[in-house]
Amino acid sequence: MARITVEDCLKHIPNRFELALAATYRARQLVQGHTPKVEAKDKPTVVALREIASGQVGIEMLKKVPT
């Protein structure tokens, strides 16, 4: 299992606060049943960070209203 670091995610979302919000919103989506865009062996928060680090999810998460 490869480790995910904040630095990997900050390459795609440079603001730490926006990164935390985007990861939170995406993790909530995953819990609600949305399909993960990367391999989903881990908890939803880790999967969300992996998606951000791979560039498949980004700042656009902040423009969506969480439900």
Curated annotation (Swiss-Prot):
Pfam families: RNA_pol_Rpb6. Keywords: DNA-directed RNA polymerase, Nucleotidyltransferase, Transcription, Transferase. It catalyses: RNA(n) + a ribonucleoside 5'-triphosphate = RNA(n+1) + diphosphate. It comes from the Bacteria. Its EC number is 2.7.7.6. GO terms for biological process: DNA-templated transcription. GO terms for cellular component: DNA-directed RNA polymerase complex. GO terms for molecular function: DNA binding; DNA-directed RNA polymerase activity. It is an enzyme of class 2 (transferase). Belongs to the RNA polymerase subunit omega family. NCBIfam families: rpoZ. Promotes RNA polymerase assembly. Latches the N- and C-terminal regions of the beta' subunit thereby facilitating its interaction with the beta and alpha subunits. The RNAP catalytic core consists of 2 alpha, 1 beta, 1 beta' and 1 omega subunit. When a sigma factor is associated with the core the holoenzyme is formed, which can initiate transcription. This is DNA-directed RNA polymerase subunit omega. It comes from Cupriavidus necator (strain ATCC 17699 / DSM 428 / KCTC 22496 / NCIMB 10442 / H16 / Stanier 337) (Ralstonia eutropha). The lineage of its organism: Bacteria, Pseudomonadati, Pseudomonadota, Betaproteobacteria, Burkholderiales.
